[in-house]
């Protein structure tokens, strides 16, 4: 079972990155099935700076089961101004 919930904004390392490659990105969780998560890449810095975000196509990703994957905030947190 995944620790992510629908609506979470997460920092995660995509599973397709090769050994030695770095690159944690921020994603909005759209659906979670444990081993695969439907996410939408977002530019969180853009939200903080301009109040909006770039939207990219959603995709199923196998997130690296890396302990550094973490929930940054939830959509509810954002709506309540806790960003």
Question: What are the residue ranges of the model-derived segments?
Answer:
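Short aromatic-glycine-enriched beta-strand elements
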Residues: 36-38
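Short beta-strand-centered aromatic/proline hotspots
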Residues: 20-32
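Short, charged beta-turn/beta-strand-edge "cap" motif at the junction between a beta-strand
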Residues: 15-19
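Intrinsically disordered, low-complexity, charged/polar segments
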Residues: 40-83
């Amino acid at each position: 079972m995944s620790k992510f919930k629908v609506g979470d904004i997460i920092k995660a390392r995509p599973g397709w990155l090769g050994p030695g490659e770095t690159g944690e990105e921020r994603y909005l969780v759209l659906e979670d099935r444990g081993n695969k998560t439907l996410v939408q890449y977002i530019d969180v810095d853009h939200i903080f700076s301009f109040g909006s975000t770039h939207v990219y196509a959603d995709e199923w990703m196998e997130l690296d089961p890396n302990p550094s994957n973490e929930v940054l905030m939830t959509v509810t947190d954002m709506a309540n101004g806790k960003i």
